[in-house]
Amino acid sequence: MSDGENLFVDLMAFFQTLLPICKFFYSIVRMSSGVIPKLNSRTLGWLSYLHKKCLTEDDWSEDGEPLDWWDKSSNPPVLSFARFDLSESSYALGLMADVTPAWREVYSEILNGLCERHLTYWAAYDWLTQFGHDPDRNNYPKEWIDLWIPDHKIGEYDTPGWVANGIEPWGLQADPIGADGNLFFKGWLNLIQCLHVYTKGEDTWGQPFQVAGVDRTRFEWTQHTLVSHLTSQWQENPFGPHCENTKIWPYCLSAAGLGLKLYDSIFHKESHSVFHEWVEFTKGKYYGFDASGGLEWTPIYYDPIIDHVHAAGPSNGLTIAFYMIPQDPIFAEYLYRTATKKLGWDNTKKGIKIKPNLRFLALGLACAKEFGDLIVESRLKAFAEENFEPRWFGKDNMYFGHFFNLKENWPRGQWAALAMMSEVGEKGAWSNLFRNPNLEKFDAPTLSGVDFPDLMVSSAYNNKRDGTLYIALTSQALGKLNKRTSIKISNLPDPNLIKIKRDGATYDSWRINQKNEIELDTTYSTTNFQIYTGWSATEAYSSRKFKTLKTSVEGNNRVSAKASSVKLVNVSCCPCCPSLGT
């Protein structure tokens, strides 16, 4: 080899040694340019509040009662149960985990608290206390009858929200999961458990757990047996399993389908096909279309015993669209666009009016952001700023939430949780969580040991292109500002390759703890770290933490007939879908 060739080889070797450093400094520029995803201050404030809410012990058993910050008041009679606060509070946590995939310990901790509470007496309160027909069904007020009761069944029909456990043909069923009905309990439980697994990276609920039943009984399940049971029920009932006895809610089934979607993505199964078959089978019965194919009405609930669809105008479809977006984006967007047009939200010359409560608008705002509908999003966002009463509260103003001018001590749980959906992530984030979940994060460098909420994490992101972990920390703990603390980074390919910058300067105050982990000194302050780890995710995620068994579901090409009875209600008085007027 000539001297020139030797020089060329030496230069190439030299540049190879410089490449990681060049990538590292280039990555700092990318960090400052805003490419790295980040949680905003409101999201961190809400996260801090959820952390306090979930980690404060309370008693959801037969002998206790949830603390008053758990929402048991919103949207009676159908949603005024504490378990709906558990489910609604989980959604934004999944989005947060995708913004900071390298830091998940607090999300997992909160979701564990939500899951544990969902197994209790108070989570299944309606199923465990509402036996037989509603003794007050002869005394419903007129506005209640107009909204909820089929015209030909007045005086002999139970209102939505009354589960009627024990009526024929099902009889008394003590197990809230094993029951033929109670879909809204088991469907949302699986969804929350999936989000917990998605943040923790372990098959936690694959181990047996106990769920509270009638008369202090307990029933043993795993998440996998729950999903198998739910899927079997759905296959056997093409209209969908019911929530209250006799009532099938497409709203609840869409949420249950979302849980199956994420379950399949994590565990590599095929249970979600029942959702698509259900949509196609029931579309002609549950939705009303005019001769040109335009949407005229959408379902509230369906009673297969009397073949009755209880329906509202197109605007009601927003409640279904929110859950359907990751599963059937085309039909979901059709429901959304029709609803926003009917409501006039896309008309800049028309004011936004919706009352007496704001849950519906929070769902619309989340959908607008998801679809990238900038006109509707900006209009609803402005309305929310004026009417949702967003504010900071608690010690050092550490917590954030929406109070909705209700003059209550805490943010109204269900509504406030939905309102936070528009604060987290970018366009398409809700769909991406379920359609393209980030599972490789479990093998990537991971931040832990953060003294949350006194020290908060706004960014924790592994950039595969430059092998760098970006971390942004902040603190609102006035009593600890600038005091020393430490954090840990695990799942490192080789700790000996580590190079660290703190706020742009080389940083050496760190040490190797064990084979694949380092400990890093920091302070309670606003700090940015760029940590070159060399991780590039060159190999596909192995799913080593999860089962890979597959199940199949036979196809169903049937289509349902029109219902014998349809009641189209004026939902202007509806506490669940307020003042839609269409």
What are these regions (language model features)?
Residues F8-S74, F81-R83, S90, L95, ...:
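Terminal, non-catalytic domain-edge segments
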Residues P101-K247, S254, G293-E296:
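Extended ligand-binding groove/face enriched in aromatic
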